[in-house]
Curated annotation (Swiss-Prot):
PANTHER family: ADP-RIBOSYL CYCLASE_CYCLIC ADP-RIBOSE HYDROLASE-RELATED, LEUCINE-RICH REPEAT-CONTAINING PROTEIN. This is Disease resistance protein LAZ5. The TIR domain mediates NAD(+) hydrolase (NADase) activity. Self-association of TIR domains is required for NADase activity. TIR-NB-LRR receptor-like protein that may play a role in plant innate immunity. May trigger hypersensitive programmed cell death in response to pathogen attack. Involved in tolerance to tobacco ringspot virus (TRSV). Residues 261-513 form the NB-ARC domain.
Length: 1170
């Protein structure tokens, strides 16, 4: 075979697929000349009789950008042409190739349907038995005849040739432009992926569709005939290719990521099995359900004797009735439109025997109700084993019980989103750089939804930068018309209650806690018991999403919903009024519209003009108000804000239906007498002026949350005495509250009570709230006595109180998980039965300066993970095997840390900063990952070996690949101690190298340490004075045994330095160079994050893996290599690196090391003296 030139190019722009005997010496020769003149590279098979082996041809197809398939009258006689076409269509479906059909003296429909003269050439004279016939048929059916060029439409061959060349140029320009756009937006893509925006789609993988609107019906010719003319919809947005009157070709965008989606669907359907499979394709509006179903159908329909794609079943049912669906399905499957099929609900029974004869492949698109499925499928007993059924729907919950499996179509990934958007926004034109940068706003807003990406692309196409910037400002305010039309159809299918809750979430409760939202909307109609399920229904319809325990909504849905709610203000839309925009609220109040239609008001008082005040009867006629929030978006934590209510007249709140009342800085002493909290779920009055909630006691049967925080005048809580279902009560900062009422015992559901900074509270009287699980009394500075008010407490916070001890009953809190007594400076002892708290995981005693011991029975705590004893006088800690983190900082009583510390078998973190009398550090547990003895200025010696049981070079499962040991400002360390630290560092580096080699770890391992000193350890075989090191590596320095790099820097901190506040890092930039290439990268050696001055010089040692070297192949391993290392500090301008060192860490075989360990003296081996 030969190419179009003597030297084969690396790739071809055009592969020409044709029947040689028909065209080679005529049309093809002229085409080749025209392509050459146009500078277009192409591939033509010049062999008269092609080889049986088509591998080379297939490779050429894979290397091409465009396949030019020229169909002539004798084309179907050539099995080589047909095999090429099969390969071409495979590449087209993968989105890796574009096909340009040319019909040369043959009709496009004959090619697609394999009939007429073309069909005779394919099937005639016994050829129908050829084994590849099914593949050829499928490929021919897939040829997009609409985008083809037909010789019959041109005056002569030259005119056709000119059009082919022109069309190829346009397509190549699009490919080049798309590539440039992708490259220029690559940074945006990386930013999007790095931020990992919580998208609406439950899945985060790529999106398979070529269509941006899966809610429109298909336009395939074979199915258009099945739909009455009046019901046919327009073509999809820029996805159906057409031939203009002038013959120009407009190509559709490629099927981005379609193959992985098809593969997942094919796995679910298992086409090779004899089992009947029913699979639902679901997802939010515009995500590509229909496109995926269409593509799947077109690929597999020829494998079944009976098949049908039923477009837009929901719309067909609305226009023609339910029974029409069944009739149309049966007529298509039985291939007889003259059958006398009635309009009963189960006509399948009359045709059952015939239907059971053959397997079927059915794709039912856009089903919206169970009734539609039941009408279409009846009892399901007419479907032959091995049949495959696919149903697409926007309602996943509706499909349950009908399908055995569902596939949720995921959103587009970042790269495909970029390409999809730019394909529509720029077309064949080059994207302007300033517009490319603005694209990220639309990409972030669309979050991979192809409907939104395509719609915005079309809207912006041809517009200038000013138009783009203007649209960005209105993204969240005004819906795109195309998006709006699709979403409006979905909205209209909801029940009235679903519509209300959908709008409530969008306008008021987006991103709120799921349980909270469910409870608030659950009580929208007190007589209804079904409201709890409305959020679940909306989730099943992909109109809301539960992510991280919160109710989320895609931005396009939220904008649509808010726009719909805003229209209710000026139009008779039968939608309740939801007001959150200050201007809308003012307009509504000034025009005195129907107050009883208001459902919710969220008023940001910081937006209200200073000169405006509100009358006390503003809410008097809002009898249906359910949600009221008055707040300030610029209000500081202390509640400073501008609120402009006329406080002369008492407010009137005759709101019987209110569910949510949030009023920041409520200015009156109590809620008015006409306020009825019978339906109240959440009461929020932070920073208010109330002295009591309301007059007397009122029934609050469904109140679950009450927040009265920082209501500094509050003294009386009796008004909430009947809140039997109250779960959370926040009284933080209520500085006038002296005590809790005895009637709180009626709060049978209370689980959370926050009384932080209730500085007038002196004691907790003997009340019992057995349901309470979390009690916060932090910074109740006058609280001297604590009584156990619930034996079911799980978290107890007494930090900052004046208590001197815990009552004996505290030992009976067997469910307690967290006990925080930080800063209890009067605390002298702990209960002897503290060890009975078997569930305790965190014990915080920081700053308890009088505490000298802990009970010995704490060793029996099997779940204690965190023990903070900093600022205490405790000298010894009982051995707690479960302990993972221990803090003993600022302990002035401890001189020698206990010898049995190495037995703390799960200890990962040990912090002993500023223990000014500590002199000795024993052997540390082998599992320890982090040690910090910063500022232990009297520390003199450490045990040798520093870490216990270092008898092997191989890490066991208790050890981690990342560890840090810091001895900063430990200026009295003996030289032996420094040597022990250095030797441990060498040993750790060797161990990590072995582990990285054994487990084939290329990244993630890291170790660093620092200690006072000015000498680079001798085991660094490359050393230099200053901050630059340039060792020369001999040939073959890089081999499979290389696992890591050890680096050392001696940092000098000047005596006149400013105190170092915050953090600084020691880094090294490495550049490997030889005659054939270079590689540059940065490594971290260590960092410090301690306030104060670093005194004297310090040695920093770090180990990093060779991942950058292993990932880079431009440095040939057999050449000598020079390494330039530049050591430097960040955020420590008055300090500098004065000496440095470097060592490559190699590993050996496991057997050799074990033999050395067995035969060598351990001490000598450990010290690295062999």
């Amino acid at each position: 075979m030969a190419a179009s030139s003597e030297i084969l190019p690396e790739s071809w722009q055009v592969f020409i697929n044709f029947r040689g005997a028909d065209l080679r010496n005529g049309f093809i020769s002229h085409l080749a000349g025209a392509l050459t003149s146009a500078g277009i590279t192409y591939y033509i098979d010049t062999e008269e009789v092609p080889s049986e082996d088509l591998t080379v041809l297939f490779k050429r197809i894979e290397e091409s950008e465009i396949a030019l398939s020229i169909f002539s009258s004798n084309y179907a006689e050539s099995k080589w042409c047909l095999d090429e076409l099969v390969k071409i269509m495979e590449q087209v479906k993968k989105g890796k190739l574009r096909i340009m059909p040319v019909f040369f003296n043959v009709k496009p429909e004959e090619v697609r349907e394999q009939n007429g003269e073309f069909g005779l050439k394919l099937y005639g004279e016994g050829k129908s038995k050829r084994p590849n016939i099914p593949n050829w048929e499928n490929a021919l059916r897939s040829v997009p005849s609409k985008i083809g060029l037909n010789l019959a439409n041109f005056r002569n061959e030259k005119e056709l040739l000119d059009k082919i060349i022109d069309s190829i140029k346009k397509v190549l320009a699009r490919i080049t432009r798309a590539s440039r756009v992708a490259e220029s937006l690559n940074g945006i893509s990386k930013d999007s992926e790095a931020k990992n925006v919580d998208t609406f789609s439950p899945n985060s993988s790529d999106f398979p569709s070529t269509s941006i609107d899966d809610d429109l019906s298909i336009n395939s010719p074979q199915y258009q005939a099945t739909i009455p003319p009046a019901s046919r919809e327009g073509e999809r947005l820029n996805t159906i290719s057409t031939v203009s009157s002038t013959g120009s070709i407009e190509h559709p965008p490629p099927n981005y990521g379609i193959e992985p989606r098809l593969k997942e669907m094919e796995e679910k359907l298992d086409f090779d099995s004899l089992e009947t499979k029913t699979v639902g394709i679901v997802g939010m509006p515009g995500i590509g359900k229909t496109t995926l179903a269409e593509t799947l159908y077109r690929k597999w329909e020829h494998k079944f004797e009976r098949s049908m794609f039923f477009p837009d079943a929901s719309k067909m049912a609305n226009e023609h009735g339910m029974c029409w669906l069944q009739k149309r399905l049966l007529e298509e499957l039985l291939k007889d439109t003259n059958l006398n099929i009635g309009y009963t609900t189960n006509e399948h029974e009359f045709c059952k025997d015939v239907l059971l004869l053959k397997k079927v492949f059915l794709v039912i698109d856009n089903v919206s109700s169970e009734e539609q499925i039941e009408t279409l499928f009846g009892k399901w007993n007419w479907i032959k084993n091995g049949s495959k059924i696919v149903i697409t729907s926007s309602d996943e919950s509706m499909l349950k019980g009908f399908v055995k499996d569902t596939y949720v179509v995921p959103s587009l990934n970042s790269r495909d989103s970029l390409l999809w958007f730019t394909n529509h926004a720029f077309g064949l034109d080059d994207a302007q750089g300033n517009l490319v940068k603005l694209s990220k706003h639309f990409l972030n807003y669309a979050k991979g939804n192809p409907l939104a990406l395509g719609a915005f692309g079309v809207e912006l196409c041809g517009k200038d930068k000013a138009d783009w910037e203007k649209r960005i400002k209105t993204l969240t305010l005004i819906s795109n018309k195309m998006i709006q039309d699709v979403l409006r159809r979905r909205y209209d299918e909801l029940t009235e209650r679903q519509k209300d809750i959908f709008l409530d979430v969008a306008c008021f409760f987006k991103s709120e806690n799921e349980s909270y939202v469910r409870h608030v909307v659950n009580s929208c109609d007190s007589e209804s018991t079904k409201s709890w399920d409305e959020i679940t229904d909306l989730k099943g319809k992909f109109l809301v999403n539960i992510s991280g325990g919160r109710v989320e909504m895609h931005d396009i849905l939220c904008t649509f919903a808010k726009e719909l709610a805003s229209q209710a203000l000026t139009e008779d839309t039968r939608v309740h009024l939801r007001l959150w925009n200050y201007q809308d609220i003012m307009w509504f109040l000034n025009n005195e519209l129907e107050m009883e239609n208001v459902r919710g008001i969220f008023l940001d008082m910081s937006k209200v003009p200073e000169e405006m005040t509100f009358d006390g009867n503003i809410f008097s006629n809002m009898c249906n108000l359910r949600y009221l929030k008055i707040y300030s978006s610029v209000c500081h934590k202390e509640g400073e804000g501008i609120f402009k209510f006329d406080t002369v007249r008492e407010i009137q709140l005759p709101l019987d239906k209110v569910r949510y009342l949030h009023w920041m800085k409520y200015p009156w002493e109590k809620l008015p007498s006409d306020f009825n909290p019978e339906n109240l779920v959440d009461l929020e009055l932070p920073y208010s002026s109330i002295k009591k909630v309301w007059e007397g006691v009122k029934d609050t049967p469904i109140l679950k949350w009450a927040n009265l925080s920082y209501s500094s005048k509050l003294t009386n809580l009796l008004g909430l005495s009947n809140a039997k279902n109250l779960e959370r009560l926040n009284l933080e900062g209520c500085t006038s509250l002296l005590k809790l009422p005895q009637e709180m015992e009626n709060m049978k559901s209370l689980v959370f009570l926050n009384m932080r900074r209730c500085t007038s509270l002196t004691c907790l009287q003997s009340i019992k709230v057995s349901s309470l699980k979390i009690l916060i009394l932090s910074d109740c500075s006058k609280l001297e006595e604590f009584e156990v008010i619930s034996e079911n407490l799980e978290e107890l916070y007494l930090d900052g109180t004046a208590i001197k001890g815990l009552p004996p009953a505290a030992g009976d809190l067997t469910r307690l998980v967290v006990l925080n007594m930080e800063g209890c400076t009067e605390l002298e002892s702990l209960p002897k039965r503290l060890g009975k708290q078997k569930a305790l995981q965190e014990l915080v005693l920081s700053g308890c300066s009088k505490l000298e011991s802990v009970p010995t029975d704490v060793k029996d705590m099997k779940h204690l993970r965190l023990l903070l004893l900093d600022g205490t006088r405790i000298r010894k800690i009982p051995k707690i095997k479960s302990l993972k983190c221990l803090c003993l900082s600022r302990n002035i009583a401890m001189v020698n840390l206990q010898d049995n510390l190495k037995d703390f078998s799960n200890l990962k973190c040990l912090v002993m900063k500023n223990c000014e009398n500590l002199r000795y550090l024993p052997s540390l547990p082998k599992c320890l990952e982090y040690l910090n003895v910063y500022g232990c200025e009297r520390l003199e010696s450490v045990e040798n070996p520093l870490v216990a049981d270092r008898l092997t070079l191989f890490l066991d499962r208790s050890e981690e690949l990342r560890s840090t040991f810091l001895f900063t400002n430990c200026h009295n360390l003996f030289q032996d101690a420094k040597d022990s630290i250095s030797t441990y560092a060498k040993w750790k580096c060797h161990r990590l190298a072995v582990e990285c080699y054994e487990q084939d770890i290329v990244s993630g391992a890291f170790f660093n340490t620092c200690y006072p000193g000015y000498i680079v350890p001798s085991w660094f075989d490359h050393q230099a004075v200053g901050s630059v090191l340039e060792p020369r590596l001999e040939p073959h320095w890089y081999n499979t045994m290389l696992s890591g790099i050890a680096l050392c820097a001696v940092v000098s901190f000047h005596e006149n330095q400013d105190p170092i506040i915050g953090s600084f890092s020691v880094k090294c930039t490495l550049q490997f160079e030889n005659e054939d290439g270079s590689l540059r990268f940065d490594c971290d050696i260590g960092c410090l994050n301690e306030p104060g001055m670093i005194e004297a010089d310090h040695v920093f040692i770090g180990y990093v893996t060779c991942s950058r070297l292993k990932d880079h192949h431009s440095i040939p391993i057999h050449h000598p290599t020079t390494v330039k290392m530049q050591f430097h500090l960040t955020d420590a301008c008055k300090s500098k690196v004065v000496d440095c060192g470097f060592r490559l860490m190699y590993t050996q075989s496991r057997g050799c090391l074990l033999e050395e360990e067995v035969n060598a003296n351990f001490t000598k081996l450990y010290l690295g003296l062999l």
